[in-house]
């Protein structure tokens, strides 16, 4: 009979400080550190019980079914950058099942993955993909918020022919958000990178690619990139409008100063 485990992925913060967690977190009284990488800490509490902490704000848990205990563990990982004001922290966690059966052939299914054995390396491949998936959910929500803000600005332009009901600062914040999301996906989330083991083990690479396909990471990334291109183009247009408005204001100020200078000159002559 196949042994079944569940793995859960939670987005809890904008980022997690791995150094502080490694040195200070009370979670160390329950779990022992099994592996340390640049953007990842892997803890274990026994056979097939893992806790992975990613620098980009995601925690994955395997082999623990008690949701109350999971919630308590997440509270112990409080070192990092909190969500910004106005952000919704309730990103839905993702879950996926692992069926371990020495007699079965390994495969990636819709709601579970079949493995002959569950090694740490195989678990980390699944954990990596799920962590990226739940982080993409967060990015998708942020991009949707940014698109909504841009839609409101464009509606103002369409209705009034000028920017009404908004200010330069809010527009610049919207522009900056698109760049921040690109940076997050490519650098911190490392969406385009493959784990080192996939370069050394063909079976690991096949498993990783099948998992990415199942969670539609590549398709979702392309969809996000298309939306970000739209946001980028809209942002450039808005920056041009802001630049033109500032230039117009500057011209008016110069004209007023010249007029004042002429008035003082006339007063002096009189």
Regions found by a protein language model. Give the residues of each.
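Short, intrinsically disordered, mixed-charge
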Residues: 75-82, 141-148, 187-190
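Charged, alpha-helix-enriched surfaces in structured cytosolic catalytic cores
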Residues: 68, 130, 134, 180
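Generic alpha-helical structural element
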Residues: 62, 128, 132-135, 174, ...
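Short Lys/Arg-enriched alpha/beta "domain-start" segment
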Residues: 1-118, 125
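Exposed alpha-helical structural elements
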Residues: 20, 26, 69-72, 138, ...
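Residue-level signal for secondary-structure boundary elements
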Residues: 33, 82-85, 89, 147, ...
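Juxtamembrane/interface alpha-helical elements of multi-pass membrane proteins
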Residues: 104-169
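Membrane-associated alpha-helical segments
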Residues: 154-263, 268
């Amino acid at each position: 009979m196949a042994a079944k485990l569940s793995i859960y992925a939670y987005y809890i913060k904008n980022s997690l400080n791995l150094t502080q967690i490694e040195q200070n977190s009370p979670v160390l009284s329950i779990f022992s550190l099994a592996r340390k990488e640049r953007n990842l800490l892997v803890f274990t509490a026994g056979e097939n019980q893992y806790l992975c902490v990613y620098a980009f704000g995601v925690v994955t848990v395997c082999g623990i079914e008690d949701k109350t205990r999971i919630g308590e563990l997440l509270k112990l990982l409080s070192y990092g950058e909190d969500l910004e004001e106005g952000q919704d922290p309730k990103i839905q966690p993702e879950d996926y099942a692992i069926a371990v059966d020495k007699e079965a052939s390994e495969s990636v299914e819709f709601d579970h993955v079949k493995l002959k054995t569950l090694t740490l390396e195989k678990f980390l491949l699944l954990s990596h993909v799920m962590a990226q998936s739940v982080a993409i959910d967060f990015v998708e929500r942020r991009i949707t918020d940014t698109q909504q803000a841009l839609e409101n600005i464009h509606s103002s332009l369409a209705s009034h022919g000028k920017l009404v009901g908004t200010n330069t600062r809010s527009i610049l914040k919207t522009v900056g958000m698109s760049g921040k999301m690109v940076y997050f996906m490519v650098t911190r989330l490392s969406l385009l990178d493959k784990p080192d083991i996939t370069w050394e083990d063909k079976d690991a690479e096949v498993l990783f690619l099948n998992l990415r396909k199942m969670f539609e990471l590549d398709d979702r990334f392309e969809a996000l990139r298309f939306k970000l291109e739209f946001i980028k183009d809209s942002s450039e247009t808005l920056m041009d409008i802001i630049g033109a408005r500032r230039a117009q204001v500057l011209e008016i100020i110069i004209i007023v100063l010249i007029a004042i200078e002429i008035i003082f000159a006339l007063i002096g002559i009189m």
